Amino acid sequence: MTEAISYFRARTLKIIVAGALLVFMGFSWESNHLNSPHADADNGGLFLPDGFQALVVVDSLKGQARHIAVNKNGDIYVKARNHYLNGGYGNIALRDTNGDGKTDIITPFGKYDGHTYGTAMRVHDGYLYFSSELMVYRMKLKRDQLVPDSRIDTIVIDNPPYHEHQTKPIAFDNKGHIYVGWGAGSNAGQVNNRQPGSPGIGDPGSPDKGNPWLKDHAGIWRFDANKTNQHQSDGIRYATGLRSLVALDWDPKSNSLYTVAHGRDDFRMIWPDLYTPWQSAMQPAEEFFKVNEGFDGGWPYYYYDGIKNKKLLNPEYGGDQVKEGDGAKLAQPLIGFPAHFAPNDLLFYKGKQFPAHYKNGAFIAFHGSTDRAPYPQAGYIIAFVPFKDGQPSGPWEVFADGFARVDPILSVSDAVYRPMGLAEGPDGSLYVSETEKGKIWRIMYKGDKKAFGTAQLAAMEKRKQTASNIKTPDEIKDNLFKDMPTTSVVYSTYCIACHQADGKGDGNRFPPIAQSEWVNYNKTRLINVILNGLKGPVRVKGLSYNEVMPGHGSFLSDAQIAEVLTYIKSNFNNLPEIVTPAEVSAVRKMTPKQNYDHD
């Protein structure tokens, strides 16, 4: 009997221990990522506030990266920027198997529409949501399964054609809704997109004669997050007057939707008689909005002047940097960030790892400018805005810098990394993705949270005031072209904003002209493109681009076109060749005038 009792006790103890071990193992697999790993000695090359450290989760991904999401067990999901380089797959799954914070498993998955603007990647209510340029999809996630094997459901459907600003960012409220951004296929609502001097369509004072892009674009639509195959007509237009939005998030603390919108481009290129290069580099502000139902941001009629802190009428609608029109009646930004910083993600911090200063505040990923020349390109940072009661409670801060790795940034292609996506890990770490290599960082706080204060922010505040990619440039001293060899006046006025000072484009929207087959192998075609413009999609050096190239024949003379094409063909490692005014004239006569003369 005693032996039986001893056996029973021993067996029971083994079962208890084994059960506890299994529970611990199950728990530890899900939570071992919650134990903050060691940071890289150089913080992955980043500058951070005192007490913060960083490590590189993955150095590069073949498909590059747009937005990212982190599951509750630490698995990372990446929206691939380039499906072709990713084996045709649109998503990438990452897992750390040993708790050192570094990726050990990289698995591409999910085949769907493969254009490069598609942005979203979010984990919500047990599903993985992601987007292409036209669609929003989701897949059911299963516990401990890295790559979902569930079917891809289509949640929201947009219709072709493809055009600029189609990114489909998403956000979720606490009532079962998904919010989807619908960018406008236009820069400033012009009759001829991005063409110098072309007027805007519509009357800002007459809703019945409004810009046609406002009917089904340039806004945010709300849908049922759990219903499939919804078209735009099945949703509710929640907000309008937003040209291009990539950064979108719902703040559970204030129970509100927020966005940081991209301002318009090309004041100098389109209106060279109204804007100096410095004014064009400084305007307009990138607007941080709280978005309530019925919101109107004012595009395309108005822009926000970040120096005067007021909305002004766009020149396409009779603006002259002074006229305000009805701008004061429109939604005003919480903050006007510096022009062309390119806000590409927004995240309200809900974790407990960071000091109290960051609780419920907003992190913003600024991808970086393309059109600030002749001044340094700017942005390329992670910013932070402290919040209280749904409103900013202090000035915006530089949270992370050092992504570009060069100073100053003359052309966008000089930047080694461009921050793109933000995600919060289960332990409160902040994850940052970037587009050029697909690199991902994990930022952690290792200091004394109670001691965190102004002193720990001092070095980053100094960067805000002095770094060339962040500070307000001096109009004379910071002009990077003042000491450079003479360039083409036509190129610096009309071409440099898109194709850049080095001719390499921006790697995403605007194609390179350096060593380009469009420049080197068919002179007649090249002249025709300058005269009449070109609409995408087009392939340049193996990559697809979908931005409009405006025709220049209506405002440039034969001599000016010959001069700029000779300059382009004689630079940027192209095949040198002279283009004459007579050759331009001959091509002009071959083309019906209405194709390029819109005046």
Say what each PLM segment does:
Residues 481-506, 521-532:
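Sequence/structural segment immediately N-terminal to covalent heme-attachment motifs in c-type
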Residues 68, 119-121, 170, 245-248, ...:
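Hydrophobic core register within WD40 beta-propeller blades
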Residues 71-73, 123-125, 172-175, 249-254, ...:
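Residue-level detector of Asp-centered blade-edge/turn motifs that repeat once per structural unit
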Residues 75-79, 127-130, 177-181, 256-260, ...:
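Conserved beta-propeller blade signature
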Residues 32-50, 63, 137, 184-233, ...:
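Beta-propeller domain segments
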Residues 422, 440, 487, 491-501, ...:
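The canonical Cys-X-X-Cys-His
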Residues 105-112, 116-124, 133-173, 203, ...:
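Asp-box/WD-like beta-propeller blade repeats and closely related beta-sheet repeat scaffolds
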Residues 33-35, 304, 377, 450-482, ...:
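Flexible coil segments in periplasmic/lumen-exposed cytochrome c-class electron-transfer proteins
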